[in-house]
Regions:
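Membrane metalloprotein/metal-transporter helix-bundle signature
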Residues: 36-38, 67-68
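C-terminal motif of bacterial Sec signal peptides marking the signal peptidase cleavage site
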Residues: 14-17
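Feature captures C-terminal
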Residues: 21-36, 84-87, 91-109, 113-252
């Protein structure tokens, strides 16, 4: 009997000891580890990446064009020299690809003011300049829209009161931000006509509350990054000369 009792106690202890314990987190401690020059370089690892780093540095520092002055997106009110440059690059470079694929032409371009992330400094324009101005992977998209949807776009622009880059169009506002002139390719917008508007994939998907791109007649993904379009443009342009003009203005 004693043996049975001892065995029962033994197995009872085993069962209770095998139960899962519920551990609870009681404290989290953090420690800041600074990355400084005092950290020694791993020479074996560095020797592997050095050729790639040197190659990348060479490519990024390659001189593509020249800027006779510094261009900033804060320089104008409703249109800026750098914004006009960006929109015109998308218009010119994007149309080369679009026309080749569809035998059609881009009518106008709309980008966003916030998409310009850096100034273009006076002096040499390098590949790195393009990455600084346009660090995002945004690609050019061409959307087929009826004229009545362009009216919605113009209405968006007058309410936004920002220098969103445009090309191929002219928008004029009075002192109360009412539209007094809205032209595409120098002509009044035909509500029933199909226009081909170039933008980027972020805006096409509703970025910056630009919801007038959908629905549409059709959409064309060019698979051509805006940054690459900039690089291609800079390569064939010795000196850039963008300026503020009358494409988007307000009568005071």
């Amino acid at each position: 009997m004693k043996i049975k009792t001892l065995l029962l106690c033994f197995f009872t202890l085993i069962i209770f000891n095998c139960k899962n314990k519920n551990y609870q987190l009681s404290k989290i401690e953090g420690k800041q580890i600074e990355v400084t020059d005092s950290i020694k370089t791993n020479q074996s690892f560095d020797s592997i990446i050095k050729p790639y780093r040197d190659n990348l540095t060479k490519d990024m520092n390659a001189v593509l064009s020249f800027a006779p002055q510094t261009y900033s997106k804060t320089d104008g009110e409703l249109n800026t020299a750098i914004g006009n440059l960006m929109a015109d690059i998308v218009y010119d470079q994007g149309n080369i690809v679009f026309n080749k694929r569809t035998n059609k032409n881009i009518d106008a371009v709309l980008l966003n003011h916030g998409g310009i992330r850096s100034i273009i400094s006076k002096g040499n324009i390098t590949t790195e300049t393009a990455f600084q101005v346009m660090p995002f992977e945004n690609s050019i998209v061409v959307v087929a829209l009826k004229g009545k949807q362009l009216d919605s776009m113009m209405d968006y622009l007058r309410h936004a009161k920002r220098a969103h880059p445009v090309s191929g169009m002219e928008l004029k506002l009075d002192k109360n931000y009412n539209i007094t002139k809205a032209l595409v390719q120098g002509k009044t917008i035909d509500k029933n006509k199909t226009y081909y508007l170039a933008t980027n994939d972020y805006l096409y998907d509703g970025g910056d509350r630009m919801r007038f791109f959908k629905p549409n007649d059709s959409v064309y993904y060019l698979n051509y990054k805006i940054r690459n379009a900039m690089i291609d443009y800079f390569k064939k342009t010795d000196t850039i000369r963008p300026k503020i003009d009358n494409r988007f203005t307000q009568t005071k």
